[in-house]
Amino acid sequence: MNKKLLVQGFLGCWLTLMASLALAAAPDPQNGYLTDSTQRPPPGRSVLGIIAGGASGTYIRIASDMASVLDGPDLRIIAMVGQGSAQNINDLLYLKGVDMAIVQSDVLEYFKRHRSDQRLENKISYITKLYNEEFHLIATEKVGTLADLAGKKVNFDVRGSGTALTASLLFDTLKIAVEPTHFDQATAMQKLKGGEISALAYVAGKPTALFEKLAAADQLHFLSVQYTPDLMETYLPATLSAQDYPTLVPADQEIRTIAVGAVLAAYHWNVKSQRYRKVANFTNALFQHFNEFRQPARHPKWREVSLSAILPGWTRFPAAEDWLKNQPRQP
């Protein structure tokens, strides 16, 4: 009997202790902490995820601006670090919680050529074009023209990156067979200076920090990319000048190249679905508050955005199309 009472007493003490610990560990909403019941968004508040770029890149800063400006009682935006345009598309298609993605505009052409079974044009639409990024191709002094790179090592950046995607399309389109390498840009720059590779490709808005510290003593120069009819289907013409890179481009010259657009893409949901309505609400909020993104506190690339810009080969998200039709005067 005493043993039974002892066991009961022990169990009682143990349960009391566990209950006390649970209460002590439970978040107290009155002190500003969230309980399980309050962690969920309030009814009617849409939560959307945007997959962007690397932690130090422009894409994630653009996504963070959207999260800051549009956050409110009806909308919350989660900006997520991404791993390049190709992976961002895969995340948009298959990763739970990803409603939109910032990608390069040539990603559709890349998938058509290399993953034709995906038929992305039927699955992905664009809310708006954001801004242009320039294709930089820097080489050693031994390389005079783009054609001279045939058979030589050219760094395409890491696999799956936007640069790798654009470089692959460019050399394929121009029918110049090079030997791609896939080092990160910092490593590739050291190998370029050491003569281990002949050129380095990089897609980024000019001027980019990767080239700003180069000097004449490094014996490197930009290669010109001629804007051929085949490139016109996917890219825009662009130039690099002494104003962009004073140590690499003579004051009286310009280097011709191409530019690729950064795009805010969304899955092409059925217009009657709840997922479509969520993205449609975001689109309306983005467009209505667009002038706030052009303020000095936001990334300067916002001032290059035209909501009405058309992207060849892409289908505009229906809610964006409807908003533009009802707003004749567009920024």
Where are these regions (language model features)?
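Ligand-binding clefts/hinges and TM-proximal coupling segments of bilobed small-molecule sensing domains
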Residues: 159-170, 238-310
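An extracytoplasmic/periplasmic, membrane-proximal ligand-sensing/linker region
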Residues: 187, 193-194, 204-218, 222, ...
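Pocket-flanking alpha-helical
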Residues: 63, 67-68, 79-119, 189-191, ...
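Bacterial N-terminal signal peptides that target proteins for export
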Residues: 1-13
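N-terminal hydrophobic or amphipathic helices and topogenic motifs
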Residues: 14, 22-81, 120-123, 287-331
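Bilobed "Venus flytrap"/periplasmic-binding protein-like clamshell domains
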Residues: 45-70, 77, 133-190, 194
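Extracytoplasmic
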Residues: 45, 57, 74, 84-87, ...
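Pocket-lining segment of extracytoplasmic ligand-binding domains
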Residues: 105-106, 115, 176-274
